[in-house]
Regions:
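Short, well-ordered beta-strand elements
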Residues: 27-38, 59-64, 88, 140, ...
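Short, solvent-exposed loop/beta-turn-alpha elements that line the ligand-binding surface or hinge
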Residues: 109-124, 211-236, 285-288, 299-308, ...
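Glycine-centered hinge/linker elements that transmit conformational signals in sensory
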Residues: 176-179, 220-254, 298
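Extracytoplasmic "Venus flytrap"/periplasmic binding protein-like
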Residues: 51-124, 131, 156-168, 263-264, ...
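Hinge/lid segment of periplasmic solute-binding proteins
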Residues: 94-148, 200-207, 294-296, 371-372, ...
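Long, aromatic- and glycine/proline-rich binding clefts that accommodate carbohydrate-like moieties
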Residues: 293-300, 348-410, 414, 442-450
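Extracytoplasmic/periplasmic substrate-recognition and gating elements
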Residues: 27, 82, 137-138, 159-161, ...
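Extracytoplasmic/periplasmic solute-binding protein
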Residues: 135-144, 149, 174-226, 242, ...
């Protein structure tokens, strides 16, 4: 063997010996995050997870969609019983009471402080934080994907009736709908009356008018809360909606009927809808070419002192029973999500709103709201912060609330099909909903909400 080859062989042997002598790089600690978003939103979550994993080398989050919110909660309960629960899980607003009573979580504040992170909990918008907070104001989970309902209106159609602003009151909205009908528009406003629309129609209306949905401050003060929405201004509201429907001023739109509300508005078929700010991007991408439209806060009845609207969406819970290393990873992940730059990424790609004041200010300073397609989404923040949350407008803390929402849909269908009167339908909602609450109270007998 030549001297040159001997040198190469010796060098290679030396490198090999050095490599064997060095300790192997530690593999990152893996932990699971389960969530309920699908489609485009699932892809955005997966990108966010990828961004976190690439931002550091110590932890790797494995993000798995469970398909929808209900499945996520049910799968998490089953996994917890089998000792296979994820470290972090996304739980929708209606599941908050169940999570609080489960005791199966690691409180958000405790997690972050014990892992060396300083979070300004007062930075969260009150209208968002208090929906997920305990009765004493402590956040047990991290608000995540958040939205509220807005009025979408067709500026071109309103120009035909001499209007340049959206209606601020329901009295004005009624007059505008009649004028639009008179101007030849077949569908001045579209609504959906399914169970999912309880959030837009019953919950938002009640909050804006400071009207209770249930006793015990909407359930925050005890599991013995019972529905009383059949005794509030909500009855008048449904009466008016039904009257406007009978007059042809409102059309019911849904996927089951061939065209959902958002499609009906974006196509120019209907001139007003009430839906989530999360649909803002969808309208922008699918609107009829050249259509001028905007968003506004939902109307209230004349003489009403407007209160904050309610947040919708979900929060992130850290579950008990995981290792210290997994908790370190979970804390790092939640701190990453809390960063204003992540808020900008999230809102840009989803339509959800920032949950903290610092995130909102960062987005404003970045020019996010200055022009299309994002201009107008700041109205959602104005709606959520229209007032300091009251004992009623901080949120709804009722057990098995998804079942109550479904019952809302059943009774609204009966009302609009003339099977029952408005009062009878809402009385039935209260009666059947209270049976749900009684069963939930019995299940957690002896327990108290934190």
């Amino acid at each position: 063997m030549s001297t040159f080859k001997n040198c190469i062989s010796a060098a290679a042997a030396g490198v090999m010996s050095l490599a064997l002598a060095l300790p192997a790089a530690a593999a990152p600690t893996k932990f699971d995050f389960w969530f309920g978003l699908s489609g485009d939103l699932e892809r955005v979550v997966q990108t966010m997870c990828k961004n976190f994993n690439e931002s550091q080398k110590d932890y790797e989050v494995v993000c798995t969609s469970q398909g929808n919110y209900d499945a996520t909660l049910q799968n998490t309960i089953a996994a917890f019983r089998a000792g296979k629960q994820p470290a972090v899980v996304q739980v929708y607003d209606a599941g908050t009471a169940t999570m609080m009573l489960s005791g199966a979580y690691y409180p958000a504040g405790k997690l972050m402080s014990e892992n060396g992170y300083k979070i300004d909990w007062n930075d969260y918008f009150p209208g968002i934080a208090r929906y997920y907070a305990t009765s004493k104001g402590e956040l047990l989970s991290f608000p995540f994907n958040s939205s509220t309902a807005l009025l979408y209106w067709n500026k071109d159609a309103f120009a035909k009736i001499g209007k340049t602003e959206a209606p601020k009151t329901w009295e004005d909205a009624a007059a505008d709908m009649k004028a639009l009908k008179g101007a030849g528009y077949d569908c001045p406003m579209a609504i959906n009356i399914s169970g999912n629309e309880s959030w837009q129609l019953m919950e938002q209306f009640s909050a804006l008018h400071n009207q209770p949905i249930a006793t015990k401050n909407n359930g925050y003060d005890g599991l013995d809360a019972r529905l009383e929405v059949n005794k509030t201004k909500f009855v008048k509201y449904v009466t008016d909606l039904k009257s406007w429907y009978d007059q042809g001023l409102i059309k019911i739109k849904s996927k089951e009927l061939g065209q959902d509300m958002v499609q009906a508005f974006a196509s120019g078929d209907c001139q007003m809808i009430m839906t989530s700010v999360g649909d803002h991007g969808t309208v922008g991408k699918t609107q009829k070419a050249g259509m001028n439209w905007d968003v506004a806060e939902l109307p209230v009845y004349a003489g009403t002192e407007r209160k904050n609207s309610l947040v919708g969406g979900a929060s992130l819970w850290v579950l008990s029973g995981k290792s210290a290393d997994e908790y370190k990873g979970a804390a790092a992940f939640l701190n990453f999500i809390h960063d204003p730059k992540t808020a900008l990424f999230w809102s840009t790609n989803t339509g959800y709103i920032p949950v903290t004041n610092s995130g909102f200010e960062f987005m404003k300073s970045s020019g996010f709201y200055d022009k299309a397609p994002y201009k107008g989404r700041e109205v959602a923040i104005a709606s959520l912060t229209a007032s300091e949350p009251t004992q009623i407008t901080r949120g709804i803390r009722l057990g098995n609330f998804t079942q109550i929402r479904a019952e809302f849909g059943n009774q609204m269908q009966a009302i609009f099909a003339n099977k029952v009167s408005v009062q009878e339908g809402i009385d039935n909602l209260a009666k059947n909903g209270n049976a749900v609450l009684e069963r939930f109270e019995a299940t957690y007998k002896g327990k108290q909400l934190p």
